């Protein structure tokens, strides 16, 4: 091992090159949700909808039930 070091050639340096056509991805274009996530979202949305309708209808239905019981 003679202790000689190679001199680095100037044309061995790496250069950065960029593609002429850039491909842009929007967040909406990337499908990240699996089918099970969509089912879970639908189930949660449906539960909220049922709760809101129940709140509206319960007063009317309870009032009608009380009227029928009084007769």
From Swiss-Prot:
Pfam families per record: PP1c_bdg (PF10488)
Induction: Expressed in the late phase of the viral replicative cycle.
A GO MF label: protein serine/threonine phosphatase inhibitor activity
Signal peptide: none
Region spans: Important for host CHOP inhibition: 16-18, 57-61
InterPro entries linked to this entry: PPP1R15 (IPR051254), Prot_Pase1_reg-su15A/B_C (IPR019523)
Protein origin, superkingdom: Viruses
GO biological process terms held by the UniProt record: regulation of macromolecule metabolic process; regulation of primary metabolic process; response to endoplasmic reticulum stress; symbiont-mediated suppression of host innate immune response; symbiont-mediated suppression of host translation initiation; symbiont-mediated suppression of host type I interferon-mediated signaling pathway
Keywords: Host-virus interaction, Inhibition of host innate immune response by virus, Inhibition of host interferon signaling pathway by virus, Interferon antiviral system evasion, Late protein, Modulation of host PP1 activity by virus, Viral immunoevasion
Its biological purpose: Interacts with the host phosphatase PP1 catalytic subunit (PPP1CB) and recruits it to dephosphorylate EIF2S1/eIF2alpha and therefore restores the host translation that has been shut-down by the host. Also inhibits the EIF2S1/eIF2alpha-ATF4-DDIT3/CHOP pathway.
Subunit note: Interacts (via C-terminus) with host PPP1CB.
Family, similarity comment: Belongs to the asfivirus DP71L family.
Protein name, entry field: Protein DP71L
Source organism per UniProt: African swine fever virus (strain Badajoz 1971 Vero-adapted) (Ba71V)
